[in-house]
Each structure stands twice: as C-alpha cells, then as structure tokens.
Amino acid sequence: MNSAVQAQLAELGIEGYLNQHQHKSLLRFLTCGSVDDGKSTLIGRLLHDSKQIYEDQLAAVHNDSQRVGTTGSRPDLALLVDGLQAEREQGITIDVAYRYFSTQKRKFIIADTPGHEQYTRNMATGASTCDLAVILIDARKGVLDQTRRHSFISNLLGLKHFVVAVNKMDLVEFSQQRFEEIKAEYQAFSKNLRGETDIQIIPISALEGDNVVELSQQMAWYQGPTLLEILESVDVVKEKEAGEFRFPVQYVNRPNLDFRGFAGTISSGVVKVGDRITALPSGKSSTVARIVTFDGDLEQAQAGLAVTLTLADEIDISRGDLIVHHGANVELTNHLAADVVWMTEQPLQPGRDYDIKIAGKKTIGRVEHIHHQYDINNLSKHSAAELPLNGIGLCEWTFNESIALDNYQDCADTGGFIIIDRLTNVTVGAGMVSESLTEVTKASSDFSAFELELNALIRKHFPHWDAKDLSELLKK
C-alpha cells in the first residue's frame, strides 16, 4: 500500500475513502513530444512525488536502474512506465503505456505515448481517449518537428486543453530567457491549430521534480501553478455536459417479457426522465420513462454515465442507432469528408471497400477521393494519390447506408470511426468527420461487395490480365 492511500485511510476510514474515491472526477491525459524529451520520467516523477508508488515498485526501480538506468546512481523513474524489454534496452517508449493514480482532488489515467515518428499511430491511439495533452519540449532543443506533429494530431483528435511542459530546465541553468524563447516559438506555431485551444506553458525539470508537484526553488521567476495543480483544476466534465444529448445504443436489454431497455454510455449532454427523444435513423419519437443503472433509477444522467433508457412507447430501436433529443439537428448522410490517420503498411487508396465502425454502428465505406495530405511538420497541405503509414489526410467517403453523425470536434463518439480491412479484419485507420456532404444516391448494381473487392485485388496483383474496373463500369 502506498503512503498516500495509507494517510487517507487513516483519516477517513475504509468506507469514507471508498465513497470519496467513487465521487472524484476523472481526467484522462497523455504525455507526448519528441523522443527523449522525458515523457516517461515525468510520469514517474508525478507518481513518486504524489506518493503513488508502492515500496516493492520503488525497490524494483532501484535494482533495474543499476542495470539499464540512465540517471547514474539515482533511480531512473522512467522505468516505472517503460515496461517492454525493447523500451528499456533502447531507452525509448514504443507502446502506449497506461498508468492510474489519484490525489485527494481527482483520479487520473495517464497514457504515455511514443515519440518516434514510426510510432505515430500508437500516439494517435493514445490521444483518442484523452481530455488533455501534456506536450514536452526539451529546453535544449526547442520546438521540434515531432512536437508539432503531436500537437497537430492531438488537436485533430479534438483535445482542447494543452499543457506545454518545457522540460530539462536544469540543463539550461533554469534560464528564464530560454523558457521565454521556446514559449514564443510554440505560441506562434499554435496559431495554426483548429478551434479554441486552452494552452498553458510551464517550465519544469522532471528529473529534479521542479514545478511538477512542488514549486521550484530554482525558478523563482515563474509565478504560475505546478503541473499537478493544472491537472487537478482543469474542467472537462462541464464541457461534455454542455453539448447536445447523444446516446449511441450499444445493446438492447431485454432480460424478460416485461422489460425492454436500450443500454449504452451517454456521449454528450444530459437526459432527464420525461424528455422527448428521437431515434435515428428511423426518426421515430417517444418519451424517456426510466433511466436505469445498477445502483437504481436516476431522474437525470449526464455524459460519461453508462445507463439503460426505457421508453414510454414500443418503437423499433437496435444496436448502432442514435437517441437524441426531439428536434435536435443531426446530420443523416452516407457521404462525408473526414480526416484519416492511416495505421498500416499498405497505403490507403481510393476505390477500395472497408468495414466502418462508428458509435456501435457497423457499415461498409470507401474513399472516393483524397483531397490532400497534411505535412504535419508545418501544417501545410499537398495533393496525394494515396495515404502512407502514419499519413494524415482529408478524404471523401461514401457509406453503404445513411448514418446519423456529428462533426468530430462537436462529439468524438458520434463523429469518429475506425477503418477495418475486410480481408484481414485488422484495424487499419481512424477517421474524424469534418463535414457532412450531400447524400449520394447509389446506382443499383449486379455486383456484390465481395465481387468488387475481388476485382480490385485481381487488378492490383495481376495487371497483365487486363481486367476491367467494375466500379468504373457502374458509373457509366
């Protein structure tokens, strides 16, 4: 048991501690930045200084530091997070590592993401579930290409809170001038980011602990909050509750003939008993009769809660449908523009069918056209015939059916989708809806999706057969 938990148990007792812990708000955040900026060391320092490390963990870190550590005689706190053998041997992060801790004010889930460019897809995976990004910058190197890359991806994935931590200030003699130079450079870059982004920039030393949990004695010129104070005070719950009500149905709950409810997690907004709702895509309406949870019925539920809704009327709703407030403005379309992060070696090419999963709904979609690929080092755009591994671009999609969706910046759950290869069943990309386009009326076809897919494979691997493109024939 760590010392922080021991102190709280002594003060509150077991029941009091569990009750307090249950009602704490949760912040999911990630650490990102260029390789060797100190992301894993920062997480280790947060855990250590907030007294969240068990004695056996600390003893193991001391032992491992003598073998693979990089901090001399001191314990290498990065080893608390870098768990893979390859990570420890190379001194880098490869996989996304998750860590959990809590203070008296809040619970935290940390995603430690890799800095190397070839692991950008891992970083995007970590960012997709987070509310805040801690972006580390080495005070000696300043803003690097990978710093811009991770800032852009975090912004693209809808994160509205950034904490830019200028790390390794101890290696530049805690220079205020150097900090101000980096601050100005990042602020100039951040003007190109989308939407309103809350950016706070602080000087830290993860190795020494300056401005991480306690204010630094070496940087008296800095008068702002510590990193932990920022993490404990940022408000992300109210932002989700302020959005329009969205409830993707994950499961139709019918344990007996007398009960029929629709289970899922509220993506945004608030719902109350008696609210008039509409189910999409059917457009049928009813009234919320009950909000059922494991702990009993609620009169009101907000974003983030897993609930079962029962309705006053028997209307047809199935998995993948979306429940919204009656009269809500929701796009229903099979044609859209979406930013895509590509995550596999085989590039994304227009004309190929993929399985699409969006908010519990599964359908088939294809890229009709790649509008442009982003140069994520300077945020410029250039034309592209295909998207390579780790490439990010704006693509025009058509789906086999109309789906209720939002822009990703408005609601991530109903505006984000994953792209699955239909032959291997491997997730090959992630999409973020940026715009709903005019619905496409598809021509009737004598060719099945399988036949079109087979035709595409034959044309790719056996070009000497001179097979005709069936999808082009359908357009004539």
Curated annotation (Swiss-Prot):
Keyword tags: ATP-binding, GTP-binding, Nucleotide-binding, Nucleotidyltransferase, Transferase
InterPro entries with a match to the protein in the record: CysN_GTP-bd, CysN_II, CysN_NoDQ_III, EFTu-like_2, G_TR_CS, GTP-eEF1A_C, P-loop_NTPase, Small_GTP-bd
Lineage: superkingdom: Bacteria
EC number: 2.7.7.4
Pfam families: GTP-eEF1A_C, GTP_EFTU, GTP_EFTU_D2
tr-type G domain location: 24-228
Pathway terms, separated by semicolons: Sulfur metabolism; hydrogen sulfide biosynthesis; sulfite from sulfate: step 1/3
GO biological process, one term: sulfate assimilation
Region described as G3: spans on this chain: 112-115
Region of interest (G1), residue spans: 33-40
SUPFAM superfamilies on file: EF-Tu/eEF-1alpha/eIF2-gamma C-terminal domain (SSF50465), P-loop containing nucleoside triphosphate hydrolases (SSF52540), Translation proteins (SSF50447)
Region G4: start-end pairs: 167-170
Region (G2): 91-95
Molecular functions per Gene Ontology: ATP binding; GTP binding; GTPase activity; guanosine tetraphosphate binding; sulfate adenylyltransferase (ATP) activity
Binding site for GTP: 33-40, 112-116, 167-170
Keyword GTP-binding appears in the UniProt entry: yes
Chain spans, region G5: 205-207
Catalytic activity: sulfate + ATP + H(+) = adenosine 5'-phosphosulfate + diphosphate
Family of this protein: Belongs to the TRAFAC class translation factor GTPase superfamily. Classic translation factor GTPase family. CysN/NodQ subfamily.
NCBIfam families, A to Z: CysN, PRK05124.1, small_GTP
Subunit structure: Heterodimer composed of CysD, the smaller subunit, and CysN.
Main function: With CysD forms the ATP sulfurylase (ATPS) that catalyzes the adenylation of sulfate producing adenosine 5'-phosphosulfate (APS) and diphosphate, the first enzymatic step in sulfur assimilation pathway. APS synthesis involves the formation of a high-energy phosphoric-sulfuric acid anhydride bond driven by GTP hydrolysis by CysN coupled to ATP hydrolysis by CysD.
Name of the protein in its database record: Sulfate adenylyltransferase subunit 1
Organism encoding this protein: Vibrio vulnificus (strain CMCP6)
